[in-house]
Amino acid sequence: MSVQIPVALPQNAYEIAIANGGLAAAGTWLQQADLKAGTKLLIVTNPAIGRRYGDRLVAALQEAGFIVDCLTLPAGERYKTPATVQRIYDKALELRLERRSALVALGGGVIGDMTGFAAATWLRGISFVQIPTSLLAMVDASIGGKTGVNHPRGKNLIGAFHQPKLVLIDPETLQTLPVREFRAGMAEVIKYGVIWDRDLFERLEASPFLDRPRSLPANLLTLILERSCRAKAEVVAKDEKESGLRAILNYGHTIGHAVESLTGYRIVNHGEAVAIGMVAAGRLAVALGLWNQDECDRQEAVIAKAGLPTRLPEGIDQAAIVEALQLDKKVQAGKVRFILPTTLGHVTITDQVPSQTLQEVLQAIANP
């Protein structure tokens, strides 16, 4: 099975390739993306992914004539820092990577974000390839060119837009993905259903396998990957630099990022935080008269069915969430912009959220 989805940007167009066995054929895919044999490639990965898939990828790329080296970085959101990216720069310097060289991100969203940021800034910009191995990275983080690292006071505050040459998705890598990480990716899939693709939402809602990722039928997994990637590609093609429409992809992320930051990126993972953020956004939309209660309840039920949290972590200070929102990247003129549903498949962007309403919603989803 192979599906190719174009990301139709005026100057930086590329393809998302969804291909079973894609890792073994990586050399061919990179050549089709205009990376030539003889190019120096630095694969950036983490220990677990490197052990499982590193040798296979290196062999495939070397067979295609690429000059390949690897760098293993620690796993986890708390390591997505400038200090960790410095290690990529150091390795690039050691290997004497040139402007015609390329970085290859093999892993989840953290690896992809850091590798992309290093590629955006090394020699003022070199090529990079995304080979995501988590569901979350496949359907979201690897697509669209957002790269960056965290600041101690906020998530992704340091970054750049830098589009990959190729996104290569091999669904077979999901077979070894821990269940919790698979569920985290489902949060982003549910997001696409709410903001863009009502039919996708209803298929998720009807599936008896949503809480059993290991039992997910292959045809449903293929649909999830293809429809999610198409949704992201369509939005990015319309608004590459997030000047308007693309902000809808941050649905659930406004409060979600605050939750991640306040818990030190240790208690909840990104997908879990987004799930909590979607619950909050849905309830805000109902409170403001933008969304009906029935669809809000349906969203919350699907999130819970997928094994994702619908309440804030215990002990989190709601006032601290409100304060952390002021560091959100979408703040304009001191006002936090929220992405709120109006009907399944459609959302609106507003900065007209009374602080009292926000506090009431946060109180309602607090753990007792």
Swiss-Prot record:
Keyword Metal-binding belongs to the record: yes
CC cofactor note: Binds 1 divalent metal cation per subunit. Can use either Co(2+) or Zn(2+).
Cofactor: Co(2+); Zn(2+); NAD(+)
Keywords, alphabetical: Amino-acid biosynthesis, Aromatic amino acid biosynthesis, Cobalt, Cytoplasm, Lyase, Metal-binding, NAD, Nucleotide-binding, Zinc
Residue sites binding Zn(2+) per the record: 188, 253, 270
GO biological process, one term: amino acid biosynthetic process
SUPFAM superfamilies: Dehydroquinate synthase-like
EC number: 4.2.3.4
UniProt keyword annotation of NAD present: yes
Compartments it resides in: Cytoplasm
Record field: catalytic activity: 7-phospho-2-dehydro-3-deoxy-D-arabino-heptonate = 3-dehydroquinate + phosphate
GO cellular component, one term: cytoplasm
InterPro entries (alphabetical): Dehydroquinate_synthase, DHQ_synth_AroB, DHQ_synth_fam, DHQS/DOIS_N, DHQS_C
Membrane-spanning parts: none
Any Pfam family: DHQ_synthase
Protein's pathway: Metabolic intermediate biosynthesis; chorismate biosynthesis; chorismate from D-erythrose 4-phosphate and phosphoenolpyruvate: step 2/7
Function in brief: Catalyzes the conversion of 3-deoxy-D-arabino-heptulosonate 7-phosphate (DAHP) to dehydroquinate (DHQ).
HAMAP family: DHQ_synthase (MF_00110)
Family in the record: Belongs to the sugar phosphate cyclases superfamily. Dehydroquinate synthase family.
The protein's name in its UniProt record: 3-dehydroquinate synthase
